[in-house]
Amino acid sequence: MSSQTPESLLPRHEAFLRRAEVDRPLLGAWIGGYYPAEQFPLGHRSWQVGQLLQPADARLDAFRNDYETLYRVHREAEDDFFYVGSAYWGVPWLEAILGCAVHVGETSCWAEVSRLDPRDSSRLCFDLRDNAWFQCLIRFTQDLLQFAAGRFPVCPPLLRGPGDAACALCGPEAVAMALIDGKPWVNELLARCAQVRLEVLERLHAVIPAWRGTHAIGGYACRLWTARTVAYYQEDSAAVLNPKLFADHLLPLARLTRPLADIHFIHLHSSCLYLIDALLADDAFSVIEVNLDHPGSSPPLAQYVPALRHIQQAGRPLLLWGEIGPSDWDLLQEELSPIGLSVQPIIKLPEDIRRYRWRRDNRDRG
């Protein structure tokens, strides 16, 4: 952002969503590292690795200096964005609200599989007003809004999809096999997880105001900003399913959140790119975001560039987030169009964003 005002940046963001003619992609620096603890070292280190996290432990106070640093360094980057904050995204908030024990890890926190009796999801029927983790989330969000004082937008934290939540409750193998075998209990469980997620988002939207008359999402990996309302969706459990199971069981639940916002975007890992055709055949998500995952945890970028081009050629805005080395950056410029493209590289220092300059001879590739 640097010297630019947010108001001067908005037209380029809207051009991305419209897939209007542009000379370069929408560029957003993600400063601080791939993992939550890398962005929030002081706050995360206030806990002990292995600690069983309690709602009283997750408070803004320990994270204040981290948020201030993130706000400052994102202002220094010469890009098209600014800092967007949310309650610490290293906490698996939805899983905690649903009753999973949360433990502190080296780079983030993780939810322990609760081994819920799959035939009884009745314990997921509760009043959020009586849920300690939900109240913790609301308090953290309200405290962050007060701390931000209008300097940066605040959004809901990462809330994984109902498939991810069900896997946290019962284990991914149990959920996948139940879907394959057509067990009725798994759809009841997924529906209840989806309903709780929806209720949490509705309550958060009620306490989070618009920012300068606009809306932003992305206090975690990748960001989106628009004059319209916007919501984020993640369903990493799709990695253990197939296109039909996803389309039949998880995609209908994703549509339940449509009344929450005008613009919806979904996060995908390279292991979930088989979903692209199902997503392009549906209008649930206006934008598709793809993680450029760590080498070794995903195929080389060259192997899935055709899938990225397929998204662009279908007329869907594409958002890319991850660690992008020089050779991958050259490949993206050769193969993709800047039209309807947002690139958000992970960098260590604000000045590193200068490495991501776009050649202006490939606008017709999309």
Residue ranges and their predicted role:
Residues 1-52, 66, 70, 76-87, ...:
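Active-site loop segments of alpha/beta catalytic cores
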Residues 59-60:
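Outer-membrane beta-barrel proteins
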Residues 84-122:
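A contiguous, low-structure linker/loop signature
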